[in-house]
């Protein structure tokens, strides 16, 4: 039994709006134990994720906002969102398929990032609440949107399972050859959104290699983690080496790197990483069928916005 509820889910009324000629809404999920979530079809994003801490107090570990307007106005449109058509940076905003070069919208210096100015995180998706534990969002990206070839159809299903999992399932297809890198961009603080600090969280990643980046955060080559600040093969605190005198730490202004997982490309979800909140005792295990996991430590948070709990989005408030 829960002893205390530190926070509540945001109000559905504060997520009602008309954007791009479509209605936005907030959807609640609850499993049969004590997990609760709130999600919106604006960006197919997670707004809240409430889980019990070591004292059985319900805690919101998903960093976000309490109104739809704050998401629309946010400098970073990715909080909790489904990001695409291609998450991450593409050098020069250019790529080639079958000797045809495509020019994307450039929106990060000289490069493209996170699908362009109108990436999936800025779109209103169609929504279908399947049951109390699942909701499906779907979107059709037209041929040429932000420079990407092909009509691209995507759906994501979020489920709170009775194994205390937030399960994310992505399905997509295109009628032309294209590129895609679809992610969920949740920001977490396992001590609770209001705690402000992630430096003492414990982290372990099942990876002995990572993608090195240049000063523009463009991946350049693979490097081994041994004897570097990127060795999380055993548990370390996030903040232990985050300011190390290391070229890769400096290029990312902290951690902003993809780790290549030891399991390769599994046919079923495999354990990629484990994070533990030092104060809450909340442990999060990340499972995936993908070959890598990206670790980012909120290095560009500037305190410009106010989260649901009333705290600012200060430097490294979440990961």
Which functions belong to the PLM regions below?
Residues 2-319:
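An exposed, glycine/acidic-rich loop-and-rim segment of catalytic or binding clefts
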